[in-house]
């Protein structure tokens, strides 16, 4: 049985046959809407920062949205109380209001046009000062400073690194124009990386966060390029005979794996970044595509219909025998492994729809975590706690984030638009 054209948005067959993008107008900026109820969330009060009323960015509001979106925190209404980092709040009264932690701070303009952002974190239960931070930033980096505040608070209270100052990449289509965007993890501050009248698909961050690999159709066939995020320069990575699609970086950034059809059928190859012939890794007569490395580089997960329907397999990075991974459901695609190596996210066809699933790799336990039916392109946050994915909600294209149990979701899309192919970048170095 061959794989149908709906096999994957990352596959070339899908893009050509299914018309992956609609004609709706695209929105590059996002509105975060958090839904769901978590039972183990830490209640935290984030008071409006002193001076933020005159600031271009409302730091306290951004921090509150970040922490709630993580699924680890529940905001406690600060009641409009403004408090800075130098004033000790009445922690006993905040405890009575239900808060276990509290953030206070200030944002002040400097004479040179920059801003001074300061915060202090309080343990309300123990009535302790947990420390603070300060950031001197330009006006354009005020939102980034708010995300760094969120990172500080998250790490102090959970012991894990925060992901709020990381970035996501995604693709939009407006009319006949395709654009690759790089944005904050909440979807704001989006910057156009490149635009084209021809389709752009499959953006993939390099492990360093300096490069984005992607597939362009500007040559009337799929070709893989890398885009330098800092300079905007691009480099040709794969333009072999036939199609070149579904790029994925090795964890050390030394090579790509991709789907090539230079020998006829779609097979997986490794590609050196310094040229040379690609090395064929799969040797089947079926369609093999959508490769994804495990974080330790010891395995490559991929999709194949060699068993009669699309399923997820894994193999050594040197190729050879493949082991089937998915057995629940007759149609499973778009595998991605969490950075901690514990989880496999993928999309499964259920009753005619496509839903995001998560498998615990140590046990094989599978959980469906969405109630939408057009999910695609999952990508893990670098701390493995959240997944960003594309879907349709109430008839509109959307980017969503979800916790791994599916309880807390945040819609990152605006009122409408064609927004696809999200990929979550690594921690900033």
Curated annotation (Swiss-Prot):
Residues 1-28 form the signal peptide. Coiled coil: none annotated. SUPFAM superfamilies: TolB, N-terminal domain, Tricorn protease N-terminal domain. It is found in: Periplasm. Its main location: periplasm. The Tol-Pal system is composed of five core proteins: the inner membrane proteins TolA, TolQ and TolR, the periplasmic protein TolB and the outer membrane protein Pal. They form a network linking the inner and outer membranes and the peptidoglycan layer. PANTHER family: PROTEIN TOLB, PROTEIN TOLB HOMOLOG. This is Tol-Pal system protein TolB. The gene is tolB.
